[in-house]
Amino acid sequence: CIIRNCPRG
């Protein structure tokens, strides 16, 4: 993700 800190992508 760009807005949130996602574990992948």
UniProtKB/Swiss-Prot annotation:
The modification Glycine amide is found at residue 9. It comes from the Eukaryota. Disulfide bonds join 1-6. Expressed by the venom duct. PROSITE patterns: NEUROHYPOPHYS_HORM (PS00264). Keywords: Amidation, Disulfide bond, G-protein coupled receptor impairing toxin, Secreted, Toxin. It is found in: Secreted. One of its GO terms (cellular component) is extracellular region. GO terms for molecular function: neurohypophyseal hormone activity; toxin activity. Interacts with high affinity with vasopressin V1b receptor (AVPR1B) (Ki=8.3 nM), although the displacement of specific [3H]vasopressin binding is incomplete (a 30-40% resistant component remained). Has weaker affinity binding for oxytocin receptor (OXTR) (Ki=175 nM), and V1a receptor (AVPR1A) (Ki=827 nM). Belongs to the vasopressin/oxytocin family. The cysteine framework is C-C. Negative results: does not interact with V2R (up to 10 uM). This is Conopressin-S.
